[in-house]
């Protein structure tokens, strides 16, 4: 069984631009290369891979809900929302404990450890949660979310 957990990765920029990020994208290590890539995306509306014709970044029309499956639940992360342990929170979306019974959800994660991206955006969030009592980086939040699903499904 092949289960694709990462089907769609949108990036919502502060200026209101919605960018589709391919899961195949390897983010550049230096800021200079990253800023050149983002500038190319915003001017040419897409960034293609150097080898092949795969599109790595693509500017898409707003709103975000138009690009997500029907019935998907949007969950925002915020430091001001109710604190919920991820292990208990994840269990409600996959009650049988297997990926086959998984409900479609989308997490809205901010790129900085301060602020409330789950509450400060232009699209409607179904629920906001706080997964730690202190501010976390986006990488740490993504890691905590993935680890919670791995533990719930018994992936070692």
Listing of model-derived features with the role each one plays in the protein:
Residues 113-156:
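Structured adenosyl-cofactor binding patch, chiefly the S-adenosyl-L-methionine
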Residues 1-87, 95, 150-155:
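RNA substrate-binding interface of SAM-dependent RNA methyltransferases
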Residues 78-87, 93-117:
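Long, charge-patterned amphipathic alpha-helical coiled-coil/hairpin "stalk" segments used as oligomerization
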Residues 31-34, 93, 102, 123:
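Phenylalanine-focused residue identity feature
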Residues 68-69, 99-102, 121-123:
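Intrinsically disordered, low-complexity regulatory regions enriched in Ser/Pro/Gly/Thr
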């Amino acid at each position: 069984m092949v289960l694709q957990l990462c089907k769609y990765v949108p990036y919502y920029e502060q200026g209101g631009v919605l960018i589709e990020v391919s899961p195949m994208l390897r983010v550049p290590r230096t800021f200079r290369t990253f800023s050149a890539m983002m500038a190319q995306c915003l001017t040419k509306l897409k960034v293609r891979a150097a080898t092949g014709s795969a599109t790595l970044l693509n500017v898409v029309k707003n709103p975000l809900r138009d690009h997500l499956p029907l019935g998907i639940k949007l969950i925002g992360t915020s430091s001001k929302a109710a604190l919920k342990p991820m292990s208990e929170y994840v269990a409600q979306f996959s009650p049988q404990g297997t990926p086959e019974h998984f409900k479609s959800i989308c997490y809205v994660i901010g790129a900085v450890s301060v602020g409330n991206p789950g509450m400060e955006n232009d699209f409607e969030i179904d629920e906001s949660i706080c997964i730690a009592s202190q501010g976390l980086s986006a990488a740490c939040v993504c890691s905590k979310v993935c680890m919670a699903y791995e533990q719930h499904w018994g992936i070692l």
